[in-house]
Amino acid sequence: MMLPADFFVPVSKMMLLALLLSIIICCGGAQRSEPMFTAVTDTVLPQDYDSNPTQLNYGVAITDVDNDGDFEVVVAGYNGPNLVLKYIKEKGHLVNIAVDERSSPYYALRDRQGNAIGVAACDIDGDGREEIYFLNTNNAFSGIATYSDKLFTFRNGRWEDLFSDEVNLRRGVANRFSGRSVACIDRKGSGRYSFYIANYANGNVGPHALIELDETASNLSRGIIVLSNVAAELGLNKYTGGRGIAVGPIVNSAASDIFCDNENGPNFLFQNKGDGTFVDIASSTGVDDVYQHGRGVALADFNRDGKVDIVYGNWNGPHRLFLQMNTNGKVRFRDIATQKFSMPSPIRTVIAADFDNDQELEVFFNNIAYRGPSANRMFRVGRREHADPFMEELNPGDASEPDGRGTGGAVTDFDGDGMLDLILSHGESMAQPLSVFKGKQGLKNNWLRVIPRTKFGAFARGAKVVLYTKKSGAHLRIIDGGSGYLCEMEPVAHFGLGKDEASSLEVTWPDGKIFTRSVAEGEINSVLDIAYPHEDDTVTKPTDIECGQGFSVNENGRCTDTDECIQFPFVCPREKPVCINTYGGYKCRPNRRCSRGFEPNEDGTACVAQVAYFGSYPSSASRSQALFLHCTASLLGLGFYFQIYTL
């Protein structure tokens, strides 16, 4: 029997609305409408010959250049001077203090002759003040450059280049190869850092380098700082198209590891063996990504399981978000990037931070307008209970810069309002000034900023900070030692709290030293400076610490995961008797048996292939396929409706 056409008319609008809404929800095609950033360049850093010239800029690093306790923004100038931007609170402006005056203590930092591309800062000699490394690439894409790198230290009341010292000239230690990124690592946990340089080799010319203090040959009391390149003896002198670097306790609990994403070759994941030597485990852990060309990279714990994950961009290739897993004692990484997240782009910098202080991390992709506009993109990566994190594309607002020739970027809170500020540099194919952006979302959310120090009082780059909260479990940050690609973020563990409260924090230094302390209610929305602990400081009374939900204090006064599965009465219901302890929680599932190579799914209703067993890691394909089928069903439903409606 054919129904009359007017039968469908009363419900047509509602059905159409429902079907369209279903398609929008399942396909997730739109960005959030609220812009995340607003440009403040015109007021904070107006275009200016001295402080914001229109020139080719590259890397951006955050450090305390003038030793006054506030951060400065250091910018690598390629066809112009390097810049050191200081925030003047009274004026609300960023001003370049590396002025063109030879009497200035910062004059040498300008290094007008160098074509600087990468920049990083850390304390190489243990004087409590960070040195600044500029990686120059004069007249060379790869291989040998015509001008060496610069390594500046503050000595004799001014910044001076250590590579120009006679003793270091005789040693020929200055890097003269064309490189890209530079990062800092305290490989032995001594509090003194080495600079790791990702050079871009031309055949067997231009290996990676690791430059550090030669303690036996130096006389620090007389200002004699002797340097050595120890990459060869550590097996780090690799020949490849070096691009991005990230440093921190990636697979170790404390000692700093090194991740390098490369071009025209596999990535490296150098695991620190605990004595300052390394072994490459990229292939065995699944992050070698042989056929892609890496750029920006950052470290974070996206699913809040206490393990460090790796996110990076590939040049016009699929971007990656590798979650760290531990299966039968073996470390593996699994790419969970969704189709939208992994969408290829001419990527440069990648930044992971909580820009709106809502407790969820955002990932910012800074692109370069390459053969046409290429807007920057941004995703919220949020934790889901017993599932992979969700990825929600956000609207970057003014920071989208579709015509920006993005080459670098960094985050810091230069005005002290608890919201991270974003500084982007541009260049390469077109001279453009710097851009500065402030966050617009989450202005009323709580926050906490933690700055660990080395035993010498410098910033403890590579340290791990875990913040325990009353309602949302543990949040992990790594103090940045150089990442993003050519850049280095602020040496701060920045935590957005939303409406939650912090209960305690734990800092782990690269030497394995651990310090735990409670966080008072009055310390929320403030900056905590954490000194390197003396022996007496590491002893914490358990009664002083509150860990929050899912964690409890052990006999050493540290917060550890509570194993709910051994508690009485039993936490799981009878229909799901299998209890699995997770970091900060637990999950229950039915007692389902599976064949070898398979395991129960999350609900225990079916057997699915074990990712680690088959030695592969699912990309977005499986999720994209499910999403595609769901969307297709909705579209078919819509088509069916229109077909009936027209009958």
Swiss-Prot record:
GO terms for molecular function: calcium ion binding. Residues 1-30 form the signal peptide. It is found in: Secreted, Extracellular space, Extracellular matrix. Residues 561-607 form the EGF-like domain. InterPro entries: Crtac1, EGF-like_Ca-bd_dom, EGF_Ca-bd_CS, FG-GAP, Integrin_alpha_N, NOTCH1_EGF-like, UnbV_ASPIC. It holds the Pfam family UnbV_ASPIC. Disulfide bonds join C565-C579, C572-C588, C594-C607. FG-GAP repeats lie at residues 48-90, 107-149, 285-335, 397-439. One of its GO terms (cellular component) is extracellular region. It comes from the Eukaryota. Keywords: Disulfide bond, EGF-like domain, Extracellular matrix, Repeat, Secreted, Signal. This is Cartilage acidic protein 1. It comes from Xenopus tropicalis (Western clawed frog). The gene is crtac1.
